[in-house]
Each structure stands twice: as C-alpha cells, then as structure tokens.
Design a protein with these regions (language model features):
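Outer-membrane beta-barrel and related beta-rich outer-membrane complex signature
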Residues: 9-30, 117-144, 203-211
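Outer-membrane beta-barrel "beta-signal"
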Residues: 224-236
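Repeated loop/turn-to-beta-strand initiation elements of outer-membrane beta-barrel proteins
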Residues: 104-108, 184-185
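Membrane-embedded beta-strand positions in outer-membrane beta-barrel channels/transporters
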Residues: 1, 95-97, 174-178, 229-231
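Extracytoplasmic gating/loop element in the C-terminal half of outer-membrane beta-barrel translocons
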Residues: 60-62, 114-198
Length: 236
C-alpha cells in the first residue's frame, strides 16, 4: 500500500484586534544561554517557525562566525535582524507498506517519510564551538561535536540559520522475512520461522542523530534502538 498527504499551515490571527506591528509569540526554548527561544508564532507564518539570523557564508560555502545579514539596515546586528526561516512541520507525508509471497517464502515491510521539514540542531549549536574543547577550570578537555572542526566557531552562535538543517527523512520501520514449513516429518505439523528488524534504516541529509524530534528542536534525544526479532511458530 501507498499513501501520501500534503499539509499546509498558516497562522491567521493572534490578537483580538488586528495589529500589523505585533511580532508574535516567542517559543521553542533551547539549551545554551539564558531564556533563548529559537521559534515564533507569527501571523502569516507556519506555527513554530524558526526565528534566526541569516548566516553569511564565504566563497567556499563555510559559515563566517558572527557575520549575519543586516536585514534592518541599521549597521548593526540585533533582534531587529531576526527573520522567519523554515518550518519544523513537514508539508509532505508518505507511507509505504507491502508483502511479497513466493512459494513458501514471504517478505513484508513498512516505511514512512517526511519531506520539507527542518530541525534546529541544538546539540551542535551547544557543543560545536572550539571554546568548549579546553576547560581551564579543570583543566580538562571536553567533548565537542565533529562539525566544530568544519565551522571553526570559537564562540556560541545560537541564532545562526546554519543550525536550522533539512530534516526530511525516509525510515524503514520494519522488515520481516519468513518461511513456512508444512507437514513436518509427515505428522501434519506446520512451522513458520521468521526474522524481523525494527527501525531497519533511515535515509536523511540531517547532520544530527535523528531528525524526528518534538517541535523541530534536537536537544540530546534518546536514540531509537534497532531491534532484531526471531520468531518460531509450531502448530500441530
């Protein structure tokens, strides 16, 4: 079977009286800093839209630390330069399942996909700067994410659009392969042997552990396990 869904969302009203100057409701608290929110509810936008600074990149496509687009044109970077950028909610949902039978063999599987959704990589924004590597209070070395060597940020850049990453994915939820044995030993016994893997694999461009996170913020989620099951069913 196959199914596909398209969803489009837009906030149409937040105040009792229409107020074009009302920016919206900040939400989406993140780890790092004090009281930082990375999302906003605004009229004309999707719920929980990311609210960040537009990152500037060098000619090689690398983000430049602390350099953002001055959207307000006032010559400095501040809250007036934050802008709505992408949505954590997928526009497209796909589901796929099927079963194949060949002789006494059978194969079944089920998968699903989300497309056009984005994730704020809070794990990377919190642990991806070089200043965290050496801790003088110990002194000791601390863990940082691998992209710290890619971006070479010396300090935290929590509101950089760099950390809002494509979260589209396809997940194969389970695959089962089985075989039916009939009339074992001539005594009329039947047996089915099957092997199943749950959370078989995932295809995604997301740089974090798993793009399927609540409200589009990846903040140290517990990894989903891959489970292997062997089933033997004997009938007399």
């Amino acid at each position: 079977g196959f199914n596909a869904t398209y969803n489009e969302r837009e906030i149409t009203q937040l105040t009792a009286v229409d107020d074009p100057t009302y920016l919206g409701i900040l939400t989406g608290g993140i780890s790092g800093g004090v009281g930082n929110n990375i999302q906003i509810h605004s009229v004309g936008q999707t719920p929980n839209a990311f609210f960040v600074h537009e990152q500037v990149y060098d000619q090689d496509g690398n983000p430049i630390e602390g350099v953002y687009v001055d959207r307000s044109g006032d010559g400095r970077i501040g809250s007036a330069d934050l802008h709505h950028f992408k949505s954590p909610m997928p526009n497209y949902y796909l589901g796929l399942s099927s079963e194949f039978i060949y002789g006494d063999w059978y194969l079944s599987f089920a998968g699903r996909a989300h497309f056009d959704n984005y994730v704020y990589n809070n794990v990377s924004s919190m642990n991806g700067e070089l200043s965290r590597l050496y801790r003088p209070e110990g002194p000791y070395l601390a863990n940082v994410t691998t992209d710290a060597l890619d971006v070479m940020f010396n300090g935290a850049q929590y509101f950089s659009s760099y950390y809002v990453q494509n979260g589209s994915f396809f997940k194969m939820d389970h695959i089962t392969l089985g075989y039916n044995f009939y009339d074992l030993a001539g005594i009329g016994a039947n047996m089915t042997v099957s092997a199943t893997v749950q959370n078989a694999f995932m295809i995604t461009q997301y740089e974090g552990l798993d793009p399927e996170v609540a409200n589009g913020i990846d903040d140290n989620i517990y990894p989903r396990p891959r489970v292997f099951v062997l089933n033997v069913n004997l009938q007399f």
